[in-house]
Structure formats: structure tokens, C-alpha cells
């Protein structure tokens, strides 16, 4: 009887020790169940991706083409920021070159807005936005359809003597 009681005590202590070892960092809310793919065009210039939790940040914006300048500011567009954003930080990421411009806005922890300016390339432009936290990272694939090119209606010259 004494050995059964001793085993029961050891079992209870072992379970208590295991439960005491768990902390809140182990239980992380999943912020995005799947890696979405987003398409923007001339008719659909804005797309919003919704998140399941607010424990994520914008980690970076990458493209397969070189020459895309990436800059970040606060929501008012005034103060410069660096990527990756700090935990819970909001802001706007601007991506631009001679043929393309778009922006990614994190206004709160539950949504990410993609806003297209123009894509003057002859084919769709693809970029990847990395979002995540210190435990998990996801990639959102974004495709921009080509927009209409500029057309010159007329050229006039003025000769000055």
C-alpha cells in the first residue's frame, strides 16, 4: 500500500512538473492558416488580406527583378522606418522603380492592404511579401497585371529666334 501511495505521489509531482514547464510563449496563435496569392490589375487596384491573429509583422518585400526601391514610413507617411517592422508596429511600405509602383499598408494587426499604382512592364510583375513573427514566417505572393502604357497625342515644337 505504501509503494502505491509513493508511486501516486511521484506521478502527481511529474505531471505538476510538466505543466509548470509550459509557458505562454509555447502557445502561439496562428496568424495566417495558408499562404495566400493576391492579384492586382487596372480594374482591381486594392486587395486586403485578413489575418486570424495580430501577432505578425511585415518582415520584407522581395522581387525577382532588381532595381525595385523599398522604403517604409509611419501611417502618416512622414517618419522613415526600417524593415522588418517591430512587433505590433504599423506603417506603409512603398515599392517603386521606373516602370512600377505599389504600396503595402499595415494599418492594424488584422489586415494587410495591397494598393497598386502602375505596372508598365509588358508582363505581370510578381513580388513576395514576407510576414511573420519570431516563431513562424509566411510568404504572400503578389502579382501585378500590366497597366495601359502612356500614349502621346501630339508633339509640338516652338522655335525661338
Residue ranges and their predicted role:
Residues 2-10:
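Bacterial N-terminal signal peptides that target proteins for export
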Residues 38-44:
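Short, solvent-exposed loop/linker segments at the N-terminal edge
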Residues 122-134:
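A short beta-strand micro-motif common to beta-rich folds, especially ectodomain repeats
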Residues 108-120:
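Short, hydrophobic beta-strand segments
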Residues 23-26:
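Bacterial signal peptide processing site
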Residues 18-21:
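C-terminal motif of bacterial Sec signal peptides marking the signal peptidase cleavage site
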Residues 44-111:
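Surface-exposed binding patches on compact interaction domains or structured appendages
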Residues 146-161:
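Low-complexity, Pro/Ser/Thr- and charge-rich linker/hinge segments at domain boundaries
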